[in-house]
């Protein structure tokens, strides 16, 4: 569960290392974001000599959470970290590589480009 002020790792090579959630996109009174939700975040830590800068406001989609994801078949998926992928206004990732495993539910949420770049889909 991701809420405002939560720090997340960045799971792509866009140039940012750490994000902080400042808003959850969707209904006006949503308290938590889960895997597949789009958030507004601010960049807290960057890689040197990359196009993104610190304190830049961006959109990101959550791809991993420490809170478990329950599937209809009874499988429970839980990760060791909270991670997101930076996207543009159309929903395409800004980076060209995705690091770490992601869940296949992102394909149903029309993030097929992120799923195709991922090295492992659970």
From Swiss-Prot:
Family matches, as InterPro entries: Ribosomal_uL14, Ribosomal_uL14_bac-type, Ribosomal_uL14_CS, Ribosomal_uL14_sf
One Gene Ontology term from the biological process aspect of the record: translation
Keywords: Chloroplast, Plastid, Ribonucleoprotein, Ribosomal protein, RNA-binding, rRNA-binding
GO CC annotations on file: chloroplast; cytosolic large ribosomal subunit
Subcellular localization(s) per the UniProt record: Plastid, Chloroplast
GO MF term (any one): structural constituent of ribosome
Pfam family, one: Ribosomal_L14
Subunit composition and interactions: Part of the 50S ribosomal subunit.
Role according to the record: Binds to 23S rRNA.
Family the UniProt entry places it in: Belongs to the universal ribosomal protein uL14 family.
Alphabetical list of HAMAP family matching this protein: Ribosomal_uL14
Name assigned to this protein: Large ribosomal subunit protein uL14c
Source organism per UniProt: Vitis vinifera (Grape)
Gene name per UniProt: rpl14
């Amino acid at each position: 569960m991701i809420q405002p002020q939560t720090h997340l790792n960045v799971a792509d090579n866009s140039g940012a290392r750490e994000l902080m959630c400042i808003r959850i996109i969707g209904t006006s009174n949503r308290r938590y974001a889960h895997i597949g939700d789009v958030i507004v975040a601010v960049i807290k830590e960057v890689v040197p000599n990359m196009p993104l800068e610190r304190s830049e406001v961006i959109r990101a989609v959550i791809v991993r959470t420490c809170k478990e994801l329950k599937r209809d078949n009874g499988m429970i998926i839980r990760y060791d970290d909270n991670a997101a992928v930076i996207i543009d206004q159309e929903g395409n990732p800004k980076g060209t590589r995705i690091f770490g495993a992601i869940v296949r539910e992102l394909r149903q949420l029309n993030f097929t480009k992120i799923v195709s770049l991922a090295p492992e889909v659970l």
